[in-house]
């Protein structure tokens, strides 16, 4: 009995010693467990923005306190790409086997102007049609359509990077509805539901045969995750008033299209 108690205390001390670096280290770590499979710690977006710079006529880099950076690349006055690879990767096309493409040959349109302001605890990036606002203390993004002066979407949580998975969280409005995702058999409007972005080769009810990583919102924006990886879009099914978007990729690469017409939101 005494030997069992001694072994128990020894194991407890070892677990505490292993847990200490996880509790106090600021960097993303992998928790060590007694099993052969590691538990992956969640790596959230940096909490603060330290600088912003325009690197070419259409592209802006935002630098965070952990030296990671997010790139905003404008494909027109109302279309922008948001990219972040914490492993140091640069803007690129997603890999596909067999080889495939998502964008058309000439996806860019003229950007009439690109203005950057960094003051009052906020970074503001403005074109002739949209305004992007980033809170410097949280890095949360809010986007306004300057034609209607309406906030079309805003983040409610920082971007989350897990091993092999990236998650975006947006606010859902009570009168907002969502459509798209490709062929989602038996479903048309996705409010209050979750849809899988994966080819299940199923033509039955609730099956997926031709998914697309794109949806549009009646609030005035279209969204496309620039990837061929599987994903899941949750439009308030798990958490009310919350849109949770995720794909099985370790970097962020998405397009937003801001427009007050349905046709405009459906074009990249």
Question: What would you call each of these model-derived segments?
Answer:
Residues 15-17, 43:
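Residues marking helix boundaries in flexible regions
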Residues 17-25:
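Bacterial N-terminal signal peptides
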Residues 10-12, 23, 86:
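Compositionally biased, intrinsically disordered low-complexity segments enriched
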Residues 3-15:
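Bacterial N-terminal signal peptides that target proteins for export
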């Amino acid at each position: 009995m005494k030997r069992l108690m001694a072994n128990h205390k020894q194991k407890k001390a070892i677990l505490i010693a292993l847990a200490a670096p996880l509790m106090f280290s600021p960097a993303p770590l992998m928790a060590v467990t007694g099993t052969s499979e590691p538990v992956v710690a969640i790596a959230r977006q940096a909490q603060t923005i330290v600088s912003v710079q325009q690197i070419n006529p259409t592209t802006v880099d935002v630098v965070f306190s952990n030296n990671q950076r997010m790139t905003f690349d404008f494909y027109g006055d109302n279309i922008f790409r948001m990219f972040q690879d914490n492993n140091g990767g640069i803007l690129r096309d997603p890999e596909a086997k067999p080889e495939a493409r998502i964008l058309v040959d000439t996806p860019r349109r003229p950007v009439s102007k690109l203005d950057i302001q960094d003051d009052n605890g906020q970074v503001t990036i403005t074109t002739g049609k949209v305004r992007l606002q980033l809170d410097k203390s949280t890095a949360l993004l809010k986007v306004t359509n300057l034609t209607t002066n309406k906030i079309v979407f805003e983040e409610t949580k920082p971007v989350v990077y897990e091993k092999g998975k990236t998650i975006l969280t947006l606010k859902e409005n009570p009168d907002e509805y969502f459509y798209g995702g490709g062929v989602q058999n038996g479903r048309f409007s996705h409010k209050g539901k979750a849809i899988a972005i994966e080819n299940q080769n199923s033509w039955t009810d609730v099956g997926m045969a031709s998914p697309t990583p794109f949806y549009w919102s009646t609030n005035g924006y279209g969204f496309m995750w620039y990837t061929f990886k599987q994903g899941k879009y949750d439009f308030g099914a798990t958490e009310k008033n919350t849109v949770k978007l995720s794909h099985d990729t370790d970097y962020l690469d998405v397009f937003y299209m801001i427009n007050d017409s349905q046709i405009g939101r459906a074009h990249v």
